[in-house]
Each structure stands twice: as C-alpha cells, then as structure tokens.
Amino acid sequence: MIETLHLARRGERRRESSYNRSGANRDRVVVPPGEAHAVPVLRGPGIIRHIWLTVLPETPTCYRDMRLVIRFDEAETPQVDVPLADFFLFGHGLLVDVNALPIQVSLQHQDAPPHRGSMNCTFPMPFSRSAEVLLANGSGRPH
C-alpha cells in the first residue's frame, strides 16, 4: 500500500467522527449501560481502512465491557463481535502498548489517567452494500 500512496485513486473518501457539532470542545460519545453507539451506516461498495478510538475508562474492565460490533452487507450475524481488549490485542483487559501491523495501541504515560490510550486498526474491511459499526456497552456503568 505504501508503494502506491502517491498515486491518485478513484472513489470517494469519507470520515465519521465524534466531534462536537455545537462547536464546543467535548468531542466524545458516552455509551450508557446496556446500550450501543452506532456510527452512521456506511453505504457501499467501500472499504473501512482505519478505525481510531480512545476511551476514558473509570476502570480497566471497560475494555472487556465494551464490544466492537461490525456487520457487513446487512448480514444477520455480525462478522465482528468482540471486546475492545481482544480486538486491539491486549488480553485480560490489561492495556499495554501494541505495535503490530495492523493494530497499534499507544498508552498515555506520565500524568494521564490510568488505563487510557489511543487505539488504531488498519485492517482493510471491504463491503459490497453496507457496513454498520457499533460500540456496545455491556457493563452497568456509562463508558
């Protein structure tokens, strides 16, 4: 992919973000207990090329409580349904630095709150008609 980065590609690029539409600097989504946050449905054909997120957990169990759910092309069963910890390669809910292609996790060390980091995934995830992405909270507290 990097060897063709300089070449023009056909297609439309889109991005979805949690930015605060009011203009305030509170660009985040809080997912209530037992609920899910849905990214607007992507219509295709297309490819999800990058997922980036960070979580402000009160406890380290947040990464086991929160599930990433992805369904392609209106499938009955999601193709991805996994705790964030497993998807981003830190087992037992222990947040650690990960530097592996295509997963990267960077902890915020120093004065940052504990259990906090930035998570990136660059798995290319193609779809023909649609892609639905949810972040589901299976805990008893908001995340």
Descriptions of predicted regions:
Residues 1-143:
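Beta-strand-centric surfaces of beta-sandwich/beta-rich domains
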